[in-house]
Amino acid sequence: MSEQLKVSSSPHIRSKETTGNIMLWVIIALLPATFFGIYNFRDTHAWLLVIVTTAAAVLTEYIYEKLMHKKITIKDFSAAVTGLLLALNLPPTAPIWMGIIGSVFAILVVKQLFGGLGQNFMNPALGARCFLLISFTGRMTSFVYDGVSGATPLATIRANIEAGNAALDGVNSMHMLIGNIAGTIGETSVIAI
């Protein structure tokens, strides 16, 4: 056994795909959920929230790397993916400033302070969502419009089981499939996801 193991950080498998190409494919994959979420809520605010949150993530990464004299990596689109994922995790009624705060937290605290892309301890967008949920619980959980208000499907199923009824009584599967339910911008339509 004269072989020596080479110990190094990931990635251990390499390909000719660049990070930028992979991130572009992720953005393309997120577009159906993004467009449907904006259409579903029929609101220019949702569109503005997606644009500003994504731009804030990219700008935060650029400013941080410029100030720290690091290589500028915004061309790898990872910050854009983080901003878009965060925007899709926000309620359509979230104020614009909340998207900006979330983007700054995601990029600075969760991503860059732990070494940048691939070194972060958790997904930056989900870390920012948790931060926003803890910091602004009311705004992060009050996203139900009048047209889609009511019990969540899981609450309806639970109530049906407790009452001894069929579990799916009162749960409209078609509404869940097409996205006519309450939720964040990117989570309502099973088809789009």
Show which residues each predicted segment covers:
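Long hydrophobic alpha-helical segments that form multi-pass transmembrane helix bundles
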Residues: 118-193
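A glycine-rich, acidic short-motif signal
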Residues: 50-84
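C-terminal ends of transmembrane helices
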Residues: 10, 59-71, 107-118, 193
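Hydrophobic, membrane-inserted alpha-helices
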Residues: 29-34, 57, 61, 79-87, ...
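N-terminal signal-anchor module of multipass membrane proteins
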Residues: 1-54, 58, 65
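Membrane-interface helix-loop-helix junctions at boundaries between adjacent transmembrane segments
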Residues: 78-79, 84-151
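Short, amphipathic, aromatic/basic-enriched membrane-interface segments that mark the entry/exit
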Residues: 14-23, 65-75, 93-94, 178-186
